[in-house]
């Protein structure tokens, strides 16, 4: 009997990734099917469906699921789910498909068929529907109304841009996943399926496991958060996004090197498990924090570390909106349908000169002038511009790796600071 938190949905991990003879047979069949091209973001979602990371999803959402998730944070059957997971297709492709047809999902970037799909429904994503999804998914406390949101969203919000650039139709239906792309080889030893992370945790005898979401290299604030989590748990799961980020962010292979050297030199190694997952960032702030908790439950994590501006971008969200949303979502009475992974909420963290170390608003009594807010955005800006980085911003071993990466860039990366990066607490 496992001591781990059960997968989301109450039915165990929903695995749609084929193996062995079944895989080879489906690959042959896929060669004769109509091919639907998918985006890198859809590829990441597809792999998560395949491995059980998105349990209980077994395919891409119907219109009823899409609408219910947008409106109520619930699938049509009443299971909690925070963000639409959909597959787009051009009008030309959609017109050539009938409901009940099987299609092959083709990844142009990797030049391979990733999955087969039985199309149970196709529905139009009008401009109105796309805007509706964006307002429900991406609009936070940083803007007061839809009019204000749309004044800046299409220019400044990468998640909004992705949705608005999607093709005209969505295809829904169950999938049979044939490949995990190059993630298992490109991130060997880091990329983990939920079944693999669960086995690691079980072998260690862990049950209270907070997950730490990373899309930036670990600076001192990240280190502090992880160590706080370790103090109140069996160990921490440092789970890095190895899919695509927005332009100017630091690539996954560099971030993984930084985590490796930090864990080796500054952590008790058997209290840390490092993993990677294949999604692209959505930058959906509070809703994405809920998604992070949902799929971390599938990976075996009991808690999700939520700090300031989790999964945010620019000034679209309140600093701690990603924490308070956990108190506002529906919790279905049927336990398996409710989100069980709980937030580990952590206050503002910073380096304090008077404390001579990392601290938070709960532990440091000193003035704002004594504090240095540490953020990935500020770190990237300093590295890009070649300006000095104070020792308290990051460990030397980590900064050396980052400097080497930035020195090798041929084009200068412009990094824009925003409220969450500078410590502006007005939100």
PLM features: residue spans?
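Active-site cores that bind ATP or allylic diphosphates and position pyrophosphate for catalysis
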Residues: 1-427
């Amino acid at each position: 009997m496992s001591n781990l938190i059960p997968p989301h949905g109450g039915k165990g991990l929903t695995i749609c990734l084929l193996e062995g003879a079944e895989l080879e047979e489906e690959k042959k069949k896929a060669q004769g099917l109509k091919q639907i091209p998918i985006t890198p973001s859809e590829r990441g979602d597809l792999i998560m469906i395949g491995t059980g990371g998105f349990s209980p999803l077994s395919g891409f959402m119907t219109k009823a699921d899409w609408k219910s998730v947008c409106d109520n944070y619930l699938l049509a059957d009443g299971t909690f789910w925070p963000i639409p997971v959909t597959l787009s297709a051009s009008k030309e492709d959609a017109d050539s498909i009938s409901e009940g047809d099987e299609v092959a999902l083709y990844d142009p970037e990797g030049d391979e068929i990733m999955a087969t799909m039985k199309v149970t429904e196709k529905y139009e994503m009008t401009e109105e529907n796309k805007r509706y999804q964006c307002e429900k998914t991406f609009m936070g406390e940083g803007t007061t109304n839809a009019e204000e949101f749309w004044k800046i969203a299409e220019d400044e919000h990468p998640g909004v841009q992705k949705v608005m650039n999607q093709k005209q139709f969505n295809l829904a239906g169950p999938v049979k996943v044939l490949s995990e792309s190059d993630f298992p080889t490109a991130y060997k030893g880091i990329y983990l399926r939920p079944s693999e992370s669960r086995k690691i945790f079980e072998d260690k005898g862990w049950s209270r496991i907070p997950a730490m979401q990373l899309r930036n290299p670990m600076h001192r604030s990240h280190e502090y958060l992880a160590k706080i989590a370790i103090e109140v748990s069996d160990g921490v799961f440092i789970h890095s996004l190895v899919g695509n980020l927005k332009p100017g962010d630091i690539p996954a292979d560099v971030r993984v090197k930084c985590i490796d050297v930090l864990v080796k030199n500054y952590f008790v190694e058997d209290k840390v498990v490092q993993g990677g997952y294949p999604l692209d960032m959505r930058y959906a702030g509070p809703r994405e924090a809920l998604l992070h908790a949902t799929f971390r439950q599938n990976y075996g994590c009991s808690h999700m570390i939520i700090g300031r501006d989790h999964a945010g971008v620019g000034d679209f969200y309140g600093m701690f909106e990603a924490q308070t949303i956990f108190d506002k979502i529906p919790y279905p009475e049927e336990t398996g349908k409710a989100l069980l992974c709980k937030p580990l909420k952590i206050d503002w963290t910073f380096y304090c000169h008077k404390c001579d170390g990392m601290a938070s608003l709960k532990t440091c009594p000193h003035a704002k002038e004594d504090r240095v807010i540490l953020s990935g955005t500020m770190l990237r800006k300093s590295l890009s511009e070649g300006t000095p980085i104070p020792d308290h911003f990051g460990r030397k071993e980590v900064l050396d790796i980052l400097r080497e990466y930035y020195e090798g860039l041929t084009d200068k990366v412009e990094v824009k600071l925003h409220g969450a990066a500078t410590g502006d607490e007005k939100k």
